[in-house]
Amino acid sequence: MNYSKKNFFLFIFLFVFGQIYAQNTTNISGNIIDEDKKSIPFANVILRQTKDNQLIKVAVTDTLGRFEFENINEGEYHLNINYVGFKDFKSENITLIKQKNTIIPTITLELSGTLKEVTIVYKKPFAEQKIDRTIINPDVLITNAGISALEVLEKSPGVQVSLEGNISLKGKSGVVVFIDDKPTYMSADALASYLKSLPSSTIETIELMPNPPAKYDAAGNAGIINIRLKKNTLKGFNGSISLAFGQGFYSRTNNSINLNYRINKFNFFSNISMNMNNDYQDLLIERKYLKNDGSVNATFRQNSFIKNERYSNNIRLGADYYLSDKTTLGVVFSGFYNPTTATNTNKSTLFNQFQQSDSTINAVNINNRKWWNGSVNFNYSYKIDKKGKEISANIDYINYTADINQNLENSVFLSDNTLKTQDILRGVLPADIDIYTFKVDYAQPLKKGGTFEAGFKSGLVKTKNVAQFTNEKNNLTTVNNDLSNLFDYNENINAAYLNFSKDFKKISVQAGLRMENTNLEGLQFGNPIKRDSSFKRNYTNLFPTFYLNYRPDSLGKNVFGFSYGRRINRPNYQSLNPFSYPLDRFTIYAGNPFLLPTFSHNFELTHTYKSKITTALTYSYTQNIITETIEFEGTLFYSRPGNIGTQKNLTLAINGGFNPLSWWTMQLYAQVTYNQSLSLIYGENLNNTGTFYSTNFVNQFQLGKGWSSEINFNYQSAAYSAQFVTIPFWRAGVGIQKKIMKDKGALKLNVSDVFFTFQPGGDILGLGNAAARFYSVLDSRVFTLNFSYRFSKGSNLKLRKSGGADDEKNRIQTK
């Protein structure tokens, strides 16, 4: 028998023996969470034989709190689990039967409360993939220090923010933004203004949900972005402070303080922030008026320099009262005051077909806006039993008040530079929005595994918008009844939902159904030249959701997922107001009372490898999509929201975290999206189809001795949506950080848009006998210096999430 034959028979013997041995063994797996149902990573799990307490194997939980023991002989065993700051856990006896894998029910560890102070440090990933959402941890990135919530969103995977503040997710518009599980009820520009005033230091996590579960409102074609603010429940007094100064063309500041005090049965928390954000937009708009043969009849060119001065004060105060181990009562007060002044100085020149100047208009548009917001939330939760049965209730009242004053001064000059006319348009536009909501949620674990959830919500919205315009010309003031109006809008939405979830051996399933009834009424009061007008609508819809995860291996190295959800996008309250609002002498914004809700079907396939790399293929079909439309009438361009038809969206995306070296971490997000918009806009058929690409690339380096740095890069190709085609852009950012004051403080310096390349622009299609394009330069290169400090006093357990500059290695430090 030659050597190769010996090897062959040896291989056969080992293979057969291995198969026989494997058939007589089994696997055991499970996962570990804390009392807040959060996964506990890096816990020690010891498997012991019951009869003699002999140690069999030791495992450490992964970042999702999971563990597994393979090839264990049948018999009686138990688990010992220990983790710093938690009580040691010993399981009941576990009987293992050969050829039958065992999944242990979820294990919950209790806080020990016996240590003076325990600091548990572990490296949080920038993005975490769950069955129904992607969770972003903003503190991981150095360049997120000292910036606004809107800028953090722009750097989140799959999120795009337009110049107007419209937010899209994976190439789809119609995203609804939530704060702490509550919708913001704001228009796009008001929401953008608020998010610019919200410091990144107040954000705990950002949840990206293309297909939110039935528990959430069905609003938002592209899903929900839920921003969770920081709230500490640790015993004693603790908090953090963040001070930031930024310098671009204009300066800006962003300061905040978070405080928490928990004693006995009370927990008090607060977030207070003050910031100033000054920037500019240098905007060029060119419009060509065409003859029937396509040749240019005239050209309008407008250069605008818009300076924005924003100031904001935000406050959030709350208290929880732990009536018993089962019952918690809470109240949260929040509000902001946001005065903004936008000064638009522009020069508009009209050229004839021979490109000779016909006339010039110099204009100054000063827009003073003051937004007040106040809200109060009362919440109640009751843990019915230790198995997880729970009921909770929330009552909310929210008020938004706006005081807007507009002053538009126009001076028209002839081609020889002589003054032809001069006029001033003044507008006073107060607005008031009252929102009342009440909801109840119930959760119950089922006897054979799984969880059943149900709930209902009722919301009432009342808005009042006033527009009072006057014209001043030749020292004579007259009321402008064409623009003046009074608009009231009332909306009532009632909803109920059911949701079921269950984990099987290799499959996790979640299914839900939400029903929403919408009843709305709008009334525009007349004036001397306009009649009263009104509209009413009532409709009821069902919104199913479904999620399926499949794990071929018990440890979850590969996870395949599928999800489906039906969504609705209702028009913004202000969008239904038919009044006209001048942006400049040639551009008018108008509402549209005939807007219908948008409905979409969203599908997603995902694959996640080792909880590090997620690949997703999403498809959505949207009907009656609402978007901004541009109509050309005479020399005026009207911007108004409209239902433009249908849109199909297909996106392939990959999101992953890598560690090429122990001191080097990479985070990569890339997507390719195919968009098709089929619409009839102002009598013209429009088929705007195209593919665009985008990527975010982040590199973090641990330099030792408390130093770390970051380099990030973002690129987006030309994008296609409805009437708009935007040009490509790219930008890069860098940051460096030094830990100080025994690692409780940090100094961070970052620079955004280092090469000053973020200069958006594009073309507007479907304008009939006109063509338009725009190009802008922004105050996007900003140097920001940030100081942050964490403090605590008293007996507590601190679970600290490692940020961009924390040591790369995991360590446990006990004091």
Give the location of each predicted region.
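Short, acidic, small-residue-rich periplasmic hinge/interaction motif at the N-terminus
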Residues: 33, 38, 44-48, 82-84, ...
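Short, acidic Ser/Thr/Gly-rich low-complexity loop/linker segments typical of extracellular
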Residues: 50-66
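Short acidic/polar hinge/loop motifs at secondary-structure boundaries
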Residues: 70, 183-210
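N-terminal periplasmic accessory domains that precede
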Residues: 105-107, 149-152, 191-195, 208, ...
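Outer-membrane beta-barrel translocator/receptor signature
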Residues: 218-225, 233-284, 309-313
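Outer membrane beta-barrel strand-and-loop segments of large Gram-negative receptors
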Residues: 426, 435-439, 479-485, 596, ...
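Outer-membrane beta-barrel signature, preferentially recognizing the C-terminal barrel domain
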Residues: 485-493, 537, 568-617, 621, ...
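Surface-exposed extracellular loop regions of Gram-negative outer-membrane beta-barrel proteins
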Residues: 519-521, 555-602, 617-634, 754-768
